[in-house]
C-alpha cells in the first residue's frame, strides 16, 4: 500500500476538438522573468499556441481552485499546424530563452514578452517572430541542443519525412544530411554527453550518429 496519493492540482482545457501529441508540450520560463515559475507551452495541430502560468490556491474545504482565466498568458492562432514546441537559447547574442515552433513546412523562433515584465493579472503578453527557416521537405520532428559542444547557444535539427536531417545554427542554415537506408521517419533524440543523434530505423535498430 502506497503512502502517497495523487490529486488534481490544476487543470486547463485546451480548446475544443483540437488534437495534440507529446511533442506539442514544453515547460520552461518562456517569459525570462526570474520572479516567475515555469510556464506550460502547448501547441495544437490546429495551429493554436497557448502559454499557461499555473498557480493554485487551496480553499477552506481543502480543495484546489485550479484554472483561472488569468493563468492563460497567451493564446495565438498560427497559419500552420504546430508539430513540435521547444524552448532554448535560439537567438545569437542573447542568453534569453525563446520558443521554437515546428510547422509542416517551416520552423520559426519567437519571443514571449509582457508589457510590464511581471506575472500579474492584467499583464498583456505578445509573441514576436525573431526569425524563421523554410524547409525543403515536409517536417516530422525536431531536436535542439548544444551541437558541437557549443556553450550558451542551442542549435536546431529538423527531421524530414524524406529522411533528411537539416541543421540550423540559430539564424543560419548549416547543412543537410540524409539518414542511410531510410524508409519512414522515426523518433530522434540528442545526447549531449556524446554530442550525437540517436534514432531508430525501420528495422528497429537503434542508430547513433
Predicted regions and their residues:
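Beta-propeller-forming repeat regions
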Residues: 1-209
Amino acid at each position: 500500500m502506497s503512502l502517497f496519493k495523487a490529486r488534481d492540482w490544476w487543470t486547463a482545457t485546451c480548446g475544443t476538438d483540437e488534437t495534440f501529441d507529446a511533442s506539442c508540450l514544453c515547460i520552461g520560463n518562456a517569459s525570462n522573468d526570474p520572479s516567475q515559475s515555469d510556464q506550460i507551452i502547448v501547441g495544437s495541430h490546429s495551429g493554436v499556441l497557448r502559454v499557461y502560468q499555473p498557480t493554485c490556491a487551496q480553499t477552506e474545504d481543502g480543495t484546489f481552485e485550479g484554472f483561472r482565466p488569468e493563468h492563460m498568458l497567451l493564446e495565438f492562432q498560427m497559419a500552420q499546424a504546430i508539430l513540435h514546441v521547444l524552448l532554448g537559447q535560439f537567438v545569437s547574442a542573447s542568453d534569453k530563452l525563446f520558443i521554437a515552433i515546428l510547422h509542416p513546412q517551416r520552423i520559426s523562433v519567437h519571443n514571449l514578452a509582457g508589457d510590464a515584465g511581471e506575472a500579474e493579472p492584467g499583464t498583456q503578453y505578445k509573441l514576436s517572430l525573431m526569425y524563421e527557416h523554410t524547409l525543403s521537405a515536409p517536417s516530422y520532428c525536431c531536436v535542439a541542443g548544444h551541437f558541437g559542444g557549443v556553450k550558451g547557444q542551442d542549435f536546431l535539427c529538423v527531421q524530414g519525412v524524406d529522411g533528411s536531417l537539416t541543421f540550423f545554427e540559430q539564424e543560419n542554415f548549416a547543412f543537410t544530411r540524409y539518414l542511410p537506408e531510410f524508409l519512414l521517419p522515426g523518433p530522434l533524440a540528442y545526447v549531449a554527453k556524446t554530442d550525437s543523434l540517436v534514432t531508430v530505423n525501420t528495422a528497429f535498430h537503434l542508430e547513433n550518429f
